[in-house]
């Protein structure tokens, strides 16, 4: 080979010129060995690419991917064709400002697929670790572990304003409304709710959106060393590890402080007094309607349950309360007095469509710091409201949710949002824009038409009673069939008794949860309430919905008169939403 300066020679020829020179000095056998080594390296690289593509497909990142082997074969054929077509063409892969060539695009796609697969695997590991702890329905009457963990972390819960929400029903919907109102004013928001529908990440939301997978993983890794310390401290004193819900609460408060949020909207897990969330100072306390639920842990009477829930009221706090049963009201008033708190309470009763609260009563409510739903009108996709607070009257507010109970949830949310600004009225346009954006997945949600299929997460008689009123008001279906499953600790007879007058039949179905009631037990109770001639069962949700639709459509009435209601649990609501392609 000439010693002349090689500049001017195509750089891609360097390795071939050098290889030719080396062949003068080494044996043919050695050259063959090197060629085999190069081929092996290339084969390994191709296999690595194939595995990355497999991860991409298996992870469902390619929509409608179909059969895995067929997709892989097709992708490999496409890649081979791409490279064959480029074999005799100049390399333009790096031409153009900031525009990657096709080769780079392939590499980037494969790298992204591998990265996302790694994130999914790590998220599954983190979730498994958290879920290995005591479940959230096993209340541990102590805040010591949580307070110790937060103290180690610098008490992140003290860095933001908070709205703390308890009650038996309506907590999540109210939380979502408060968050939208706060966000509409320009505040950075955090939201902590439970349980989740589709992913554990829903429980911790920033600016209305679930925390990212990477963010959830990072939050766990930030607090894990502290959780380990607290577990060890508790074990040393004969106590339990931190529970599933305690860990999530610590993660949420840490995320909110790091983001940082201006306000956190925090829903209690269960009860209030001993709930892990109850370490917030000077939070606005919201108490939605109280009824019987979780009686094993909270008490067997409304008064006992209300006592536990009123435990979130802190000295000097503003308390926003729904209208309550007499026993619950007594407990709330006592807690307000003990803490010298300011009470703003819903004083309006049920307001039917096209009716308006008496103007004198409306004025009296405002003068006494009361709250009221002054009027409701039916609207396509929801309802139009007039809401009265101590600060203002808000007219022509569109709420894209059904049911009078959602109107009252909106009233509580509005008063809570006002409390963040010293009780002052919010601009009407902000209120209208915020409520128009509200969603509440799995709460009287229409997932299909023809026939109408509704999904609701209601699981206790108190919530189902409110739902029944909303159904009769907004969905006047002549032929409604219920698809039902429930957790074993729920009042199944009470729930079915509420729905029996408006449902022609019930289809019982098993549910994917270790806490679910056995199908045979469910059918037995349904037989007692509906009569065996109106009870059916199916082994899976797909068949249950199909059977329910057939039963609902069996009459000669027009199709809009028929419907299916899927109800009984958040778990069932999630499975139903996924069945109809809804995961957000």
Annotate each PLM feature.
Residues 325-343, 452-454, 461, 496-562:
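C-terminal helical cap/extension that packs against the catalytic core
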Residues 7-27, 34-35, 45-50, 56-59, ...:
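Acidic, Mg2+-coordinating active-site environments of NTP-dependent enzymes
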Residues 263-266, 275-286, 290-292, 304, ...:
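Nucleotide phosphate-binding/pyrophosphate-handling subdomain across enzymes
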Residues 256-262, 423, 474-478, 548-563:
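Glycine-rich phosphate-binding loop signature in dinucleotide/nucleotide-binding domains
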Residues 569:
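Active-site-proximal loop/hinge segments that shape catalytic or ion-binding/gating pockets
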Residues 118, 137, 143, 147-151, ...:
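ATP-dependent carboxylate-amine ligase catalytic core
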């Amino acid at each position: 080979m000439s010693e002349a300066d090689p500049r001017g020679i195509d750089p891609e020829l360097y390795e071939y010129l050098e290889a030719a020179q080396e062949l003068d000095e080494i044996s043919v056998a050695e050259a063959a060995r090197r060629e085999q080594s190069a081929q092996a390296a290339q084969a390994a690289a191709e296999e690595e690419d194939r595995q990355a593509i497999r991860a991409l497909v298996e992870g469902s990142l390619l929509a409608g991917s179909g059969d895995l082997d067929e997709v892989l074969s097709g992708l490999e054929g496409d890649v081979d064709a791409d490279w064959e077509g480029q074999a005799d063409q100049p390399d333009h892969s790096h031409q153009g400002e900031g525009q990657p060539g096709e080769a780079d695009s392939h590499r980037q796609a494969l790298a992204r697929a591998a990265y996302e697969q790694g994130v999914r695997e790590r998220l599954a590991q983190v979730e498994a670790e958290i879920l290995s702890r005591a479940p959230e329905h096993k209340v541990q009457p102590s805040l010591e572990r949580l307070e110790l963990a937060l103290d180690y972390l610098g008490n992140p819960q003290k860095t933001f304003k908070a709205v703390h929400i308890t009650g038996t029903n309506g907590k999540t919907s109210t939380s979502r409304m408060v968050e939208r109102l706060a966000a509409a004013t320009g505040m950075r928001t955090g939201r902590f709710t439970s349980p989740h529908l589709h992913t554990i990440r829903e429980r911790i939301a920033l600016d209305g959106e679930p925390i990212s997978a990477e963010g959830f993983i990072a939050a766990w890794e930030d607090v894990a060393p502290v959780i380990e310390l607290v577990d060890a401290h508790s074990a040393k004193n004969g106590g339990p590890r931190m529970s599933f819900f305690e860990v999530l609460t610590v993660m949420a408060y840490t995320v909110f402080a790091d983001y940082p949020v201006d306000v956190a909207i925090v829903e209690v897990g269960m009860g209030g007094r001993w709930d892990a969330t109850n370490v917030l100072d000077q939070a606005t306390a919201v108490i939605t309607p109280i009824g019987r639920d979780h009686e094993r842990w909270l008490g067997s009477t409304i008064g006992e349950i209300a006592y536990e829930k009123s435990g979130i009221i802190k000295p000097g706090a503003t308390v926003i309360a729904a209208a309550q049963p007499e026993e619950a009201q007594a407990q709330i008033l006592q807690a307000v007095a003990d803490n010298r708190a300011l009470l703003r309470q819903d004083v309006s009763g049920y307001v039917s469509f096209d009716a308006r609260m008496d103007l004198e009563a409306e004025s009296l409510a405002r003068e006494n710091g009361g709250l009221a739903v002054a009027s409701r009108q039916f609207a396509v996709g929801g309802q139009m409201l007039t809401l009265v607070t101590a600060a203002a009257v808000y007219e022509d507010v569109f709420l894209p949710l059904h049911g009078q109970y959602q109107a009252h949830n909106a009233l509580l949310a509005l008063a809570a949002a006002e409390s963040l600004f010293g009780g002052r009225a919010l601009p009407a346009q902000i209120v209208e824009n915020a409520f128009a954006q509200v969603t509440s997945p799995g709460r009287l949600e229409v997932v299909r038409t023809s026939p109408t299929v509704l999904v609701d997460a209601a699981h206790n008689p108190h919530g189902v009673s409110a739902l029944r009123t909303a159904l009769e008001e907004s969905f006047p279906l002549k032929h409604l069939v219920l698809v039902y499953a429930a957790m074993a600790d729920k009042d199944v007879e009470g729930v079915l008794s509420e729905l029996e007058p408006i449902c022609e039949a019930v289809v019982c179905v098993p549910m994917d949860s270790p806490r679910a009631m056995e199908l045979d037990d469910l059918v037995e109770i349904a037989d007692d309430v509906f009569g065996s001639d109106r009870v059916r069962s199916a082994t899976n949700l797909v068949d249950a919905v199909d059977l329910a639709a057939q039963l609902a459509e069996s009459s000669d009435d027009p199709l809009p008169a028929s419907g299916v209601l899927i109800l009984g649990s958040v778990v069932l609501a999630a499975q139903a939403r996924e069945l109809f392609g809804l995961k957000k």
